[in-house]
Amino acid sequence: MFVLFQLLLATFAIYGTITYEEESRLLVPLICLILMFIVGRVEGRSTEKASARKDFLRSEIDKISQKDSTAIKEQDFFTIETLLWPKNEMILLDTVHAIFKDMGFKISTGIQYRSVDRIIKIPDTQKAFGMQVMMCEGEADRDHPKINRVFQFEKEKKENEKSLIIASTHIRLPISERGEASHISRELAGLLVRYNISFITAHHLYGLWQKAKRGEIDIFEFFQNIYSQGGEIYSPKGVEASLPPFHEFPIQ
């Protein structure tokens, strides 16, 4: 876009030199040259910023995977950034949708429900998840508005469907600081365990996606295990065991 604008300015400068008379003949090209210089500086800074951001992402990816991030495809950088540092929940949802589709799951908007973001089906089975996607500045907690939708889906879901939460937590923190952070409040974890609802952080989902792409895990088998087991919490710290029961959350 910057190049096209500079080309337009150059064309107008030539046009001004040919068309205008006296002072205007010099003034118009001069203004165009000044504008071209300014646009060039802006483009340079934009390129430097994009390069610095990519270097930061490479560094953060190396911390997650402990592998050389230079092998990562160019288009994956946007996916990674919007998964781990999302700007809004809609972009995060689109990214999670793309990841599950890339892994081979059947994913749809679940228009038959008003309380779920996506329906994810495990291929060649009748098993399905009603997925909610959450974005959290800190840890996921009971007060997040999506939690009410999760329990609404619990009332509406079919027998072969299970609730699944994908949460991008601590979105302002670098990867190095997320490993030791709490990603879900104790109260919410207890409720999810009680109602057999699984919780996966975006950080953990990224790791699963990369392992699936490298053929290190059978991703369908992994999610079949999630489906068959009780409510578990999958975070950068690993799989947390079932927690002590908390007070009942009323599903009315």
Give the ranges of each region predicted by the language model:
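Juxtamembrane interface helix immediately N-terminal to a transmembrane segment
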Residues: 1-8
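Hydrophobic alpha-helical transmembrane segments
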Residues: 17-32
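Interdomain/boundary linker segments immediately adjacent to catalytic/signaling cores
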Residues: 45-87
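Juxtamembrane "helix exit" motif at the C-terminal ends of alpha-helical transmembrane segments
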Residues: 10-18
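Catalytic core segments in nucleotide and nucleic-acid processing enzymes
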Residues: 79-245
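Transmembrane alpha-helices and immediately adjacent membrane-cytoplasm interface residues
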Residues: 31-44
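C-terminal, charge/polar-rich interaction regions
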Residues: 13, 63-67, 247-252
